[in-house]
Swiss-Prot record:
It catalyses: guanosine(46) in tRNA + S-adenosyl-L-methionine = N(7)-methylguanosine(46) in tRNA + S-adenosyl-L-homocysteine. This is tRNA (guanine-N(7)-)-methyltransferase. Substrate binds at K122, D154, T192, E193, Y194, E195. It comes from the Bacteria. It is an enzyme of class 2 (transferase).
Length: 212
């Protein structure tokens, strides 16, 4: 979803290079130096306004988190949250998620989160879905040997497509939930802004966890 332009967003990002990376290719293979520790790194692709990734970083200080988002306005909103918290284990990237293999070295990431990604419903848009095989190839490259993917959506069509796509790619499923908020998994679930909005309307939330 495209957000309305906020003139303050770009200057705010430029003023905070300690929290926002605008040239991630320069840190490929060096992310642990950015965090100044060797803790595992988890990346959310398409973090939106940043609620999920900020909460995850607060909840798990022993892990490092990176929120990746293309929209400058969304990064600006997420940055405001980070400026309030100043979490040492959280970094933001303002860049396109399709370049993941250019930002991270092989095996540099421990986990990937895909939350409420654009479903790109038209057939000609299939290749743009974040669970299309070319994206899965990138994920496999940058994830370590124990790395996993967590995927959440309210879109049943995208969920079913993703199950098939991952299965065809040879991935193994560690868990599949057709109504996340009605399951025991809901107790430890960290919600995104969209997730809270959809669930309040009674919309079931689909989730899967998988590895290569």
């Amino acid at each position: 979803m495209r957000l309305r332009n906020k003139p303050w967003a770009k200057p705010l990002i430029e003023e905070n290079p300690d929290f926002v990376v605008t040239e991630p290719t320069k840190l490929k293979g060096k992310w642990h130096t950015r965090f100044q520790n060797n803790n595992p790194i988890f990346v959310e692709i398409g973090m939106g306004k940043g609620r999920f990734i900020v909460e995850m970083a607060k909840k798990n200080p022993e892990k490092n988190y990176i929120g990746l988002e293309l929209q400058t306005v969304a990064v600006g909103i997420a940055l405001k949250k980070q400026l309030e918290e100043k979490l040492p284990n959280l970094q933001l990237i303002c860049a396109n998620g399709s370049g993941l293999g250019e930002y991270f070295e092989k095996g540099e990431i421990a986990g990937i989160y895909l939350n409420f990604s654009d479903p790109w419903p038209k057939k000609r848009q299939t290749k743009r879905r974040l669970t299309y095989k070319t994206f899965l190839e990138q994920y496999k490259e940058v994830l370590d040997s124990n790395g996993h993917i967590e995927f959440k959506t309210d879109n049943q069509g995208l969920f079913e497509y993703s199950l098939v796509s991952m299965n065809n790619f040879g991935m193994k499923f560690d868990g599949v939930w057709l109504d996340l908020h009605s399951s025991p998994e809901a107790e430890d679930n960290v919600m995104t802004e969209y997730e809270e909005k959809f669930s309040k309307k009674g919309q079931p939330i689909f989730k899967l966890e998988a590895h290569f």
